[in-house]
Amino acid sequence: YRRTAKGRYVCIKTVKSGTTSYVDKTVKSGNRYYYCVKAYNGNVLSGYTEASILYIKAPVVTVRKSAQGVKLSWKKSAGAKKYIVYRKTPTGKYRAVKTVTAKTLSWTDKTAKKGQTYYYIVKAVNNKTYSAASPQKRIKR
């Protein structure tokens, strides 16, 4: 079951016995959703426990070279409280290189070396909820 802040619970999916997870693919960015799960044994419907989730859309990111390094810019993701920038080289793994507040919509990577290729992604965060990663951006400084 799912509801919004002002709505009533509506059954969004019935799953088979033994199913322990479900992905809701109909959520909209910036909305807070409340979920509950009820068990049914054929005769009796159980009580429920409620959980609340704020869905955050992945940021839309652009990258470009600048005199100081590599400049990343992104559009605001509704509900985000901060953004985390991740970087990797062609043979490396993604590592967080910068965390900024929700008011900051750009950052320049001044540690990017000339002649090196880098890949960047950005995630929006609200408390403990992370967005999916932005589409990967590749740039050679």
Task: Annotate each predicted stretch with a short phrase.
Residues 1-28, 48, 84-113:
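Recognizes extended acidic, P/S/T-rich segments that occur
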Residues 1-4, 39-41, 76, 87-90, ...:
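Residue-level signal for short segments within beta-strands and strand-turn junctions
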Residues 29, 41-79, 114, 126-141:
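Pro/Thr/Ser/Gly-rich low-complexity, intrinsically disordered linker/stalk tracts
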Residues 12-17, 39, 63, 72, ...:
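Intrinsic disorder/low-complexity segments, especially N-terminal tails and targeting/processing regions
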Residues 19-21, 32, 67-71, 104-106, ...:
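A generic structural signal for beta-strand entry/edge sites
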